[in-house]
Amino acid sequence: MSKYPFVYFLRTSKYSGIDNFIEQNKDKLECTLEIIGENDLDKLNNLFDNSKYHILVTFGDSDKEYIPMIMPRLVDRMRNRWFHRKTIDNLGDFNKNVNCCFVFNAIMNREDVRPKFSIFTTCYNSYDKIYRAYEGLKNQLLRDWEWVILDDSPDDKHFEFLKQLSKTDKRIRLYNRDGNSGSIGHVKNEAVSLCRGKYVLELDHDDIILPDLLKDTFEVFESDKEIGFVFTDFANVYEDWRNFNYGEHLGKGNVCYYKHKFNGKWLDVCSCPGINNITTSHLICLPNHPRMWRRKVLLELGNYSEFLPICDDFEILLRTMCHTKVAKIHKLGYIQFMNNDNNNFSLIRNGEINRLGPNWIRPMFYEMYKVNDVFKQKGAYEDEKYIEKDMTQIWKRKDYEHKVCSVVSNPNYDKQYCLLGIDALNDKRISELYKNSRNDFMLLSNKISSDDLVKELEKRGYDRMKCFGLSEGTTDC
C-alpha cells in the first residue's frame, strides 16, 4: 500500500546527486515520493487535484531559483503546500516536514486550501464548442479557479470527449450524470453542489468570459462582505461574430446598447440596469450573463430549483435580488454566442419561457414574497405600472427618478467623461484626456446612429471610447 502523502520532489539537474540518497532510503520514507526535474514542470498541474498529489518539495541552495518555475504554474494558496530543503541529512526531520505540511493543509480553514472561484457548466453534446469557454478561462488574470463540468448528455460518447479536455488541466473537475435529465434547473442544482470555491460563476458551455472578469469580481466581493451577487454588461454575437441584440425596448425601457470595441470588433454591449422592483420583474430585465454569487449566499438561498426545467435562472435571480446586496461592474464581462439559425437550446424554449415566467412565476413570487414591499424598504421602488403597462424607455420619461439598490464598480477607470454630440470630439482637451488609459469615455448623440459614431471614432483614433446614438432622437432624449 502507498504511504501518504504523495509528494513531488523537484530538483534541477545540478542537484540530481540527491537521487541516489533517496533511492537508497526509499523504504524509510513516510510518504510516496516522485522525483521530477526542470523538464517535468507540466506535472505540477497535478497539484490542483488534491486527491493525487499533496505536497511539493524543492531541493537546492535556495528556493528562489524555483520561484520562476513554480509560480506561473501554481497559485498563491499552494505556497502552504510547498517547502524547500537545502540538505537532507536526517530522514526523520524530512519525514516530519512532509507529514506536518500534509496535515497542516488538511486541517486548515477550508477556504484557504480551495479555489477562489468555482465556474460551473452544464452541457449536452457540446463537443468542440466547449473549447471556446475553456480558452476564456485559461486567459483569466486570476488563475485560482476550478471548472466543474456536469455532463447531461444521453450517452457516454460525449463524456469520453470531455475526458480529453480534463486530462490537460487538473483545474477541470468532470462529472457525468447517471442518465440524461433534460431539466436545466435540476442539473444546475447538482453542479453548484459540486463546487468548492468561495465564489461561483455560471458559464454556458460555448460562451466567453473576458480576461479580467474573475479578478475584478473577486476584488468587488472582497471589498464588501455584504455583497452576495455581482454582474456585468454582456454582448450577444453569432458564431461569425455578427452582432445580435434584442431591440431598443429591452428590459422594459431600462436597457440600452452601446458600442464597444473588443478584439478588433465593435460589439453591441447591453448595459444591464440597476436593480429595483421593475427591473427584477422579468428575465429580460434581470442580469443576463455573467452571474456570480458568493457560494455561501447561493446555497443559503436554496440553490437552483430542481423543479424548473426552464426559467430556473429567473427564479433564483428573483431570490437573489430580494435577499442580498448586489453589485454591478459597469463593463463588458461576458460574450454569449447564438447559433446562426437561432436554434439555441434556450431559444427553442422561448415560447414556454415567455409563458411561464411573466404569467406565473413573476406574479406568484411577487405576491408570496411581497417583492414590491421589499424594494420599498431598499429605497428601490418604482410605480408598479411599469411592470406590465408602460414600457417607455427611461430616458423618455420626464418624471423618471433613478431608484436602484445595486452598487456600481468600475475598476478600470478613475473618471468617466460623457461627451454630448459629435462636436464634443473637437474639444482640444479630449485628446489630452484620452492619453490617460484610466479615463473612460461615452459619446452620446441624438442625431446620428451608433454605427456612424463608430466610423467617426475610428477615423479620429478614439476607438477605446464607447458610444451610443439615436438617429431619430429628440432634444429631450
Language model segments and positions:
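N-proximal low-complexity "stem/linker" segments adjacent to membrane-targeting elements
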Residues: S2-V7, F83-G136
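Catalytic core of nucleotide-sugar-dependent glycosyltransferases
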Residues: L332-N340, F345-D383
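Short aromatic/hydrophobic "clamp" motif used to bind/position activated sugar donors
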Residues: V200
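Acidic donor-binding loop at a coil-to-helix junction in glycosyltransferase catalytic cores
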Residues: P309-I316
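Glycine-rich, basic loop-to-helix element that forms the pyrophosphate-binding segment
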Residues: D178-C195
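A conserved acidic beta->alpha catalytic loop
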Residues: D151-F161, G179-S181, D204
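Short, acidic, metal-binding catalytic loop of nucleotide-sugar glycosyltransferases
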Residues: N25-L29, E135-D144
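Conserved donor NDP-sugar-binding/catalytic core segment of glycosyltransferases
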Residues: L214-H260
